[in-house]
Amino acid sequence: KIYVKRDDLMGDGSVLPPWGKLFAIRNVLLSIKPTRPLIHLSVYGSWSGWALSELCKDLGYEFIMAYPKSQKYPEQMLEKVDKCIALKPNMMSILYNKVGSIAKEKDYVRLPYAFDHNAYIETQRQRLKDVKKQLEFDHLVVSSGSGVTCLGLLLEHEPWPSLFEPENKRTFHTVCVSNEETIKKK
């Protein structure tokens, strides 16, 4: 059997998706324990800004969602977040650096790009460990953007270097939905 992790099939715009990511993001927030407002770059196609907004409300943290202003960015997503900062659309690295400048200027805490934080990666690793107790499989297929979620899952799927030994049947597959170079860096 092949099981496929598909976050893109989760969430409907009115009910938060029951992601493993949501639990991992919550763990990042709890480990940061912010005393200043949090700011995060939420890009088109991502539920992260909305999810963070809801999590921050639950945890009593102030949250600001930065986003690239464009006709494609869904208005209904913006309506769900209390405080937004529209940015001029540009390359991802430029937008992320702009959010860093805003954070420094206004004394906000900038959340790590793609939640690249040990608490997030370890939560994903533990999640797969729990799944493996219930399901037996050799192939793991994961969609990947930044590669951060993949990293936690990959670390648990099979310890290195046995993943590359010929007799090993376990295989990790990724379907790249972003830039391959960002995944290779992870």
Model-found features: residue ranges?
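PLP-dependent amino-acid enzyme catalytic core
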Residues: 1-186
